[in-house]
C-alpha cells in the first residue's frame, strides 16, 4: 500500500496547470502582482455592508411614549408623576395658589369642610351621611369637600400656599413631604368636638375658599326700561326711547351739542294731542297765522344780521304753523334733526328751536374722516398685500431649500445605485471571462479524452498514423489552433469593450453635468441682470433682493440637479439593458458548456 502511494501521480497545482495551458497556447486568467482591475470595489463593499446591516440588525422595538415606568403600580394612571413631584401628587409639583390648605392627613379645608375618616372626601358632589355602612371616601384633597357629621374646620399641615400663610400656627413647623394619599391605608377616626380654648394660639384664619355668590342687581326704577317686561306693555317701554337713541347716535357721529338733549319721555299731558290737533285744524287759516305771530320769538343765541334774523323768524313761524297743523307731537320733529337742535321740552308747545349753522362744517369733517378712513383702509390693504408677497417669497425660498435637500438625497441614492450597477458589471465581465476559460479547458478535455480512447485500445489493434497524409494533418491542426486563437481574441476584445463601455457609462454619469443647459443660458441672458429683474419686483429693497438671489440660485441648483438625475437615470437604464444582454449570453454559454461537459463525461465513462 505504501509503494502505491509512493508511485502515485500527484495532482498538478494551479501554477502548473496555468503554465501547461500557456505552453499549449491557451488563454488563462492571470493576476500580475495582485493588480486589482475592479474599479467599483468601493460600491461593492458598500452594497455588502448595507446587505449585512439589513439582514443582521434586529428590528427596532417600538417604544411607547406614553408609558411611565417605576412611577405607578400596575393598573395605575400612567400620566401621574411620583409623589416627590409635589405634596398633592400633581405631575406639575409645586404650590397651588388656588388650594384651600387641605392636606391628605387632616383632610380639612378653609371652607369649614372636614372629614371624619382621616382624609378629605374624594368627590365634591357626594356627602357622607355618617352611617356605619357608608364607605369611606378615598383620601384625596378637594377644595370643594363638604362638612361631615357637623365637624368644624380643623387645621392640618398642608403644602405651602400664598393664601394660607395667615392660617398657620406661630409654633407650627414646616411639614414634612407628604406621600401619595391614594396609597395610604384608610383610617376611621371618630368626630372630635370643637374647643375654643385649644385654639387660642392660632391666628385668625381668613376664608380664601370659594367666592361668595354675587349679589343680584337692584330692581329697576319705576321709570327705567325693563327688557323682560310682559308683552302687554307699550312699544316704547319695551324697546327703549326712539328719540333718545337717535340723539345718542347723532352725538356719537357729530359730537355733543351745546343745548341740553331733548327730553322725549312719556308725558301724560300729550295723550290729548289728537283732540288738540282737531281743534287747531278747525281754526281758520288767518286766525291760526295771527296766533302764531302773536307768540314771542325765542331769544337768539348770538347776534345775527338782519337778513338772517328775518329768515330765521319766518322759518320758525312756518315750522310752528306746520307743527300746529300736524298735531304738535314730539315724534313729528324727528325729520328735522339734521337741521335743528332741540332744547329741553318742559311743557307742551314750548320748544326752543335754534338753527345750527355749523352743520355743514361738521358734515365736511365727517367726509374728511371717512376719506381718511378709506385711505387708511387702502394703506392697510396695500401693506397686507406686501406682507403676503413677502411671506410668499419666504415660502418659495423655503420650498426651494427643501427641494434642493430632496434632490441631493435622490442624487446620492442614484449615485450609489449606479456605482453598484458598475460593480455588478465588473463581476459580470469576470464571470464571462471565467466561462470562456472553462470552455477552452473543456475543449482540451475533449482532446485528451479522444487521445485516451485511442491509447486504451486493444493491443491487437495498434494505432498507426498514415504516413502519406502527415503533412496535411499537421496543417489542419495548425489551422485549427490559429482559428481558435483568433476566435478567442475576438471574444476577449468584445468582453473588454463591453466592460469598458459599462465603466464609461457609470463614470460619465457619476461625474455630473459638465456644461450648463441651453435653458439655463437663456434664462441667465433674459433675467440674470438686476435691471431686468427689477421690472417684476413689487418693492426692490435689500431683503427682497437677497430672497430673489437665493431663489434664483436654488432654482439653478435644482436645474443642474435635475440634469444630473436625468443623466443618472438614463445611464442606469442603459447599463441595466446591457447587463441583461450579458446575462443572456452567459446563460446561453453556460448551457452549452454544461451539455459539452456532460457529453465528455459520458465518453470517459465508455472508455474501458
Curated annotation (Swiss-Prot):
The keyword Protein transport applies. Residues 1-23, 50-307, 514-533 are annotated as: Disordered. One of its GO terms (biological process) is exocytosis. Residues 100-121 have a biased composition (Gly residues). It comes from the Eukaryota. Keywords: Coiled coil, Protein transport, Repeat, Transport. GO terms for cellular component: plasma membrane; SNARE complex. Residues 390-452, 545-607 form the t-SNARE coiled-coil homology domain. InterPro entries: T_SNARE_dom (IPR000727). Residues 198-215 have a biased composition (Acidic residues). CDD domains: SNARE_SEC9C, SNARE_SEC9N. Residues 9-21, 169-183, 241-260 have a biased composition (Basic and acidic residues). One of its GO terms (molecular function) is SNAP receptor activity. Residues 54-67, 74-85, 122-134 have a biased composition (Low complexity). PANTHER family: SYNAPTOSOMAL ASSOCIATED PROTEIN (PTHR19305), SYNAPTOSOMAL-ASSOCIATED PROTEIN 29 (PTHR19305:SF9). Belongs to the SNAP-25 family. This is Protein transport protein SEC9. The lineage of its organism: Eukaryota, Fungi, Dikarya, Ascomycota, Saccharomycotina.
